[in-house]
Amino acid sequence: MTTGDCCHLPGSLCDCSGSPAFSKVVEATGLGPPQYVAQVTSRDGRLLSTVIRALDTPSDGPFCRICHEGANGECLLSPCGCTGTLGAVHKSCLEKWLSSSNTSYCELCHTEFAVEKRPRPLTEWLKDPGPRTEKRTLCCDMVCFLFITPLAAISGWLCLRGAQDHLRLHSQLEAVGLIALTIALFTIYVLWTLVSFRYHCQLYSEWRKTNQKVRLKIREADSPEGPQHSPLAAGLLKKVAEETPV
């Protein structure tokens, strides 16, 4: 991942103040105090996150790098090798991020997380199979299946009854024609059912691979209740100690 012309998210301004893009952003904000804008993008250019923070406003404490909220409702963790404000993250936010991005590592420091992936149930796929075209195709195929199945069964039964009647009347040509029609009807029905079923099974398999429930396994060293301080907490304590006047 990259952060435009800056390698850090808000809060780590030491390496960003000298860049031209940073100065342009600060001067362009004429309303209120100067602000710092950070845009986190992936390697393919997709915008993943944008944060705007005032430069002259001191931070109240560490905040989650995904939702940019503090530790009021949920404790902040430091599960990867990122330090500073990049190292703090909520467990729920990170699980949602890993689930939506279909990854199991930090996209900044490439640290592999210990995760447990569980496939989502079939009912969720039936409610939301993906794009609108796939949803429309699924609904149409289900309606056609419910309509064609009894129609094919009734048509086949009528053809067989007619073939029996023609055999009793010694009309073998008509009986053979009705039997051939029944076989053709059921062949087309079975082929259409198999093709449609295979197509939707492939869609469900792809959806299942990219839509999984990710559960982050927290190690003792990453937990805020562990015996040792995390790198984030150690850095904050060191910073506070340096800024405290003697």
Curated annotation (Swiss-Prot):
InterPro entries: Znf_RING (IPR001841), Znf_RING-CH (IPR011016), Znf_RING/FYVE/PHD (IPR013083). Changing residue 64 to S: Abolishes ubiquitination of ERGIC3 and CFTR, and degradation of CFTR. Reduces ubiquitination of DLG1. Reduces inhibition of HIV-1 virus production and VSV G protein expression. Abolishes ubiquitination of IKBKG/NEMO. The chain crosses the membrane at residues 138-158, 175-195. Residues 56-116 are annotated as: Required for inhibition of HIV-1 virus production and VSV G protein expression. Broadly expressed. GO terms for cellular component: cytoplasm; cytoplasmic vesicle; cytosol; endoplasmic reticulum; endoplasmic reticulum membrane; endosome membrane; Golgi membrane; lysosomal membrane. GO terms for biological process: antibacterial innate immune response; antiviral innate immune response; endocytosis; positive regulation of lysosomal protein catabolic process; protein ubiquitination; suppression of viral release by host. This is E3 ubiquitin-protein ligase MARCHF2. It comes from Homo sapiens.
